[in-house]
Amino acid sequence: MSIKRRIYLAAPLHDEADQARNHKLACALRAEGYEVYLPQEHGKWEDLVSKFGGKDVTRRYLYNMDLHAMQRADCCVAYMDREKGPSEGMLWEMGYMSGCNKPVFLLNPGFKWGYNLMPEFGSMCFDTAESLLCHLNEEDFIGSEVQV
């Protein structure tokens, strides 16, 4: 790949299983040559609160870091767990990226139409990581928009 594309990876981070899955997906994308921003890689919440001296300061710092990463990214890859449903943060990130006219690719194993209108029509949906990677590697998605 000649251009190192930047991907913002939006996904739930509620528990260790989510974080392990997110890490695995980020590694797969990086192995294909993409630069991946994964919010959970900031570090542990307790360590960050200690570093910045409080919860409010830490929350503002994380928000600004994530917002800056979305602005720099060429696209968003979002993961939606059908069993747990989407996270509010992930949906916000998808909407922000879509509003910036950046492509949003939704990885939703077991995807079925009719689950949620906005994520489905505001993104390109994939049901396997392999199909997502194949599409990313074949498409020149920089500057493209999702067609409805």
Where are these regions (language model features)?
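Conserved catalytic or regulatory cores that recognize and/or transform ribose-phosphate-containing ligands
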Residues: 1-148
